[in-house]
């Protein structure tokens, strides 16, 4: 404890960073000459008030996923096991996973972060041909995405914005489309899965261009 507040002020001026985790004993002198002692308590920093790195969505693998956590107190990067501990929940299946960060050492409190586990990205291929009516035809095929309920197919005409063409079930891994010679049509697909009323989309596949 500091008995001399001048010493404390001088220390604060000289230091780049001053952290006090102890009780400071002080006393107040009243007009009648009596004194009353009191203690000021300085708390450790609450880890929930620090900065955390963003955790992006992770592709489902069938195994537990433990993305790294980044915690910063100003410019200082905290150390797992020294400044905080980490526990993971619901971090295996497609859905929303939780990370609980608990302050230790010079830090207190907890912070919960969340990240999505989504169906893995698929790969799109095409095989071209002709219809009986003379139209150009292509069969779009893609690899199965583990855990997906189905797939969304989007298309773009002549460089325009992508629009949804159709949605197919998980049991179907191809789609026949028609296109016009001279036009440029592009296609892409992404898997999805519904969990507790919420839809989780995987990343887009590569883009197939037909012209």
Region locations from a protein language model:
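Pro/Thr/Ser/Gly-rich low-complexity, intrinsically disordered linker/stalk tracts
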Residues: 119-147, 198-211
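Beta-strand-rich modules
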Residues: 177-198
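Solvent-exposed, low-complexity, repeat-rich "mucin-like" stalks and linkers
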Residues: 1, 43-76
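Surface-exposed loop/edge segments in extracytoplasmic proteins
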Residues: 76-81, 160-167, 203
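Interdomain boundary/hinge segments at the C-termini of tandem beta-sandwich modules
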Residues: 38-44, 115-119, 209-211
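Serine/threonine-rich, repeat-prone extracellular segments and beta-strand-based repeat modules
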Residues: 1-42, 76-110
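Recognizes extended acidic, P/S/T-rich segments that occur
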Residues: 152-182
